[in-house]
Amino acid sequence: LLLLGHASTSTRGFSGNSFKSDLIPQSRRSHSVYGTPGSIRISSPSVPSAIVSSYSSTLSSALPSSSYGGNSFSSSTSFSSGGSDLLLGTSGKEAMQNLNDRLASYLDKVRSLEGKNHELELKIKDWYSQVIPGTGGPDARDYGHLEKEIEDLQNKVNNCRVDTATILLHIDNAKLAADDFRNKYENEQSLRLGVEADINGLKRVLDELALAKADTDMQIEGLRDELDYLKKNHEEDMKAASSGIAGQVNVELDAAPGTNLLDELDACRRDHEAMLDQMRREAERWYNEKAKDVKDKAGEAQETLVSHTSEISDLKRSIQSLEIELQTQLARKSSLESTLAGTESQYGMRIQEIQMKINVFEDQISDLRAKMEFQSQEYQMLLDVKQRLEAEIATYRMLLDSEDSKGSIINHKILTAIEKLVDGIVLSTEVLEKQIPVLSY
């Protein structure tokens, strides 16, 4: 049986056992004159045909046709057992040489597949580093180039919210000020109505005084007419008396002197004139007092009315300015809302485009993961086949080394666990059991 050269070694550990390709001690080796360079031939006088048949069937079942990364290989082994002289005859030597060549070719292909797998891993890492800079694994994602835009958008949204809150605060303050001015206006309006009612009452009093004055003037005119009438009657009576005296006989009698009518009339006239003067003075004094009071109240009411009118004008101007400012703030608010809506729609479209690119990248990553999983499964299968072959080679080495000694063969159990992983999640676990005959002394 020919094995690998002693220049290269390969160690695979499983269940606490290690297998090396350089398995034969240096003292038990004999160099082959017809083998491949770097190979070893071990000759034995006799090997049981059952062992050779078992090894042939094991190789046939352990090396199926497979493809990996575009390279295909096939392995099929057949032996014709001829008894104890299989390894001693020419056909036995050729069969062992063919087996050695096939095993060396298989191990070379395994090494090449391992190298290609390593190259694929490097390419995948390079692809991740190019597509997503600064990452080393499929789960890492870098959104660093979008952080500045997102931060700017967040700052703009926060500024718009602050401006909106400020505008709403100004609007609330303006509403409160308008309500305050409205209350003041209503109070001043009620005061104005009260003053106007007082002015109307004073006007009625003034009209009553004017009517009383007119009535007094009419009474004075009536008294004057009556006085003139009395004077006229007195003159007529005097003329009639004087004319009657001239046409009659004057008879003088000693009698008591009579009252002088003119004096009585003069006294009556003086009394009436004094009474009229007193009434006129009292009426004028009362009228002047009332007129002065009315003028004072009218002046005060006029001043109050003027001050209230000026305050009302100021309030109207303030209300107009506040309404203008309110309209300006509402227009600014609508403009900011439209700008914010446009900005949100624009950046929403950009975020959708970026999300679509991210989805494409994730699909590509999923495909790469599936390919890697498939390659990993094939690699695990080939590794398991290699371990089986190395275990059987070790068994045959022990059998060949103990050709001159007798011992018992003990079956060792080797368990191989195969896990199916998808995105780092274990879907299923399969345990393969292999019985290896080992010679014990």
UniProtKB/Swiss-Prot annotation:
GO cellular component, one term: intermediate filament
Region (Coil 2): 262-403
Ranges where the record places region Coil 1A: 92-127
Region described as Coil 1B: spans on this chain: 150-241
Location of the region described as Tail in the Swiss-Prot/TrEMBL record: 404-441
One GO molecular-function entry: structural molecule activity
Pfam family, one: Filament
Chain residue ranges for the region called Linker 12: 242-261
Keywords: Coiled coil, Intermediate filament, Keratin
Keyword Lyase found: no
Tissue and organ distribution: Expressed in skin.
Superkingdom of origin organism: Eukaryota
Region of interest (Linker 1), ranges: 128-149
Record's keyword annotation contains Ribosomal protein: no
Domain IF rod, residue spans: 92-407
UniProt region (Head), positions on chain: 2-91
Alphabetized InterPro entries for the sequence: IF_conserved, IF_rod_dom, Keratin_I
Gene3D superfamilies: 1.20.5.170, Single helix bin, Vasodilator-stimulated phosphoprotein
Summary of subunit composition and partner proteins: Heterotetramer of two type I and two type II keratins.
Family from the record: Belongs to the intermediate filament family.
Note: There are two types of cytoskeletal and microfibrillar keratin: I (acidic; 40-55 kDa) and II (neutral to basic; 56-70 kDa).
Protein name: Keratin, type I cytoskeletal 15
Natural source organism: Protopterus aethiopicus (Marbled lungfish)
